[in-house]
């Protein structure tokens, strides 16, 4: 089942009911979902595996629990760092100092060579501007498209 922003326009109580229904149907009927959402809280609740995209390319694919605990791609890290943790709102759910993305968002009609995230990446290397990183397995079941996790990278 493909669910594209299936609960984004719903109020909180209806959203919770629909999400619980998705989970119940998945467990009872063995359904698989491709659940598209910009709401990472929803993704965390309904997903076993998560794929993060940036400007139409996969940045990272991992089991949901691992991705939310140990994101590898700088974009995924920034997304998670922007989600406030429950409490005073000064910390994020990802145990890393929250960092705002800087730099210009590339023009989606005239995309740059190399990594699409390079202009906003805090770890940008010269290689990033020239070569688009391939999606590679950095850990078992955890793939990332980032030069930090390839030969010559820092990790």
Spans of model-derived segments:
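Active-site beta3 strand of CheY-like receiver
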Residues: 2
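P-loop NTP-binding/switch modules centered on Walker-like glycine-rich loops
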Residues: 5-93
């Amino acid at each position: 089942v493909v669910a594209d922003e299936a609960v984004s326009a719903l109020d909180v109580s209806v959203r919770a009911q629909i999400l619980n229904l998705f989970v119940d149907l998945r467990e009872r009927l063995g359904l698989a979902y491709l659940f598209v959402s910009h709401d990472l809280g929803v993704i965390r609740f309904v997903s076993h595996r998560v794929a993060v995209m940036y400007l139409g390319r996969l940045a990272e694919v991992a089991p949901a629990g691992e991705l939310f605990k140990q994101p590898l791609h700088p974009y995924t890290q920034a997304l998670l760092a922007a989600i406030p943790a429950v409490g005073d709102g000064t910390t994020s759910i990802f145990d890393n100092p929250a960092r705002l993305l800087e730099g210009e968002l590339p023009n989606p009609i005239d995309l740059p060579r190399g990594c699409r995230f390079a202009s906003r990446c805090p770890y940008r290397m010269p290689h990033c501007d020239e070569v688009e990183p391939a999606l590679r397995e950095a850990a078992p079941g955890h793939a990332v498209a980032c030069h930090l996790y390839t030969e010559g990278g820092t990790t």
